[in-house]
Amino acid sequence: PYLPVNSSLPQPSSSLEQCANDLAQQGYCLLHHALTNSQLEALRKRLTEQALAEKQKGFAFQDGGHSQNWGDFRDSAGELRPQEFTEAQGGRNQRVWMLVNKGAVFLDLLSHTIMRGLVTGLLGDHYLLSSHTANIANPGGVAMRLHTDQWWMPPPTRIGRAGLPAGSMSRELFDNDTESTGAISPPVAVNILWMLDEFTESNGGTRLVLGSHLSGRQPDSTAKSIAATGPAGTAMLCDGRIWHG
């Protein structure tokens, strides 16, 4: 419902201008040939080694099971519960965290010239890296619920209105002023997804609601989404406000 009628889906492009336009209008863009064949081979090899080692050592993080809601990492007392995110608890996908500590090939991604240019164009001159993680998607995983990666950002509101305090917001509880001010929050977060394998409709690629980054709202679970697709070596950059899962 947010995508203009005459718009078309972003396609993998080597043009910085086209990627910037897609990002602004649709909420995401696809950079073609972002990774060379040698980079792809090195990244796959190192990631496979690391993922296997973490499974063998017994601390692999695995999610995507029917009772494993993304974001429910703590119990009612606020304690982490890693025992709930294991293969034994139904986890299908494997997350490999903290890639900054797990190989130079992962560090090299952080200095990719074109992607850094796109990030700077969206966020400005100064920003922080908050996560560098791999997700190995396997058959049988449950689809992630639609969410934004900027859910913690309070939206603009009216003077005198008592909204939900920022510290009480969560992925499931957020402040939506039913009387729209016409203003939306700026982007303050972005994600880059490096496709080490082809992303298709059928293999669990990220789903997005096009243009939803301009809605000024948190997700409507009934919104129509599309699968982001692209060949191996493509990089996808997403505005932190876009609805995705």
Q: Which role does the model predict for each range below?
A:
Residues 34, 131-134, 195, 211, ...:
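Short, well-ordered beta-to-alpha junction loops that form the rim of enzyme active sites
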Residues 117-118, 141-229:
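Catalytic core of non-heme Fe(II) oxygenases with the double-stranded beta-helix
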Residues 103-108, 179-180, 223-224, 245:
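Active-site rim elements
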Residues 1-25, 32-169:
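Non-heme Fe(II)-dependent double-stranded beta-helix
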Residues 39, 200, 216, 244-245:
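Flexible loop/turn segments at secondary-structure boundaries
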Residues 27-28, 233:
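Catalytic palm active-site di-aspartate
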Residues 30-32, 128-131, 207-208, 237-238:
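A structural signal for short, well-ordered beta-strand segments and their strand-loop junctions
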Residues 230-244:
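Conserved metal-binding segment of the jelly-roll/cupin
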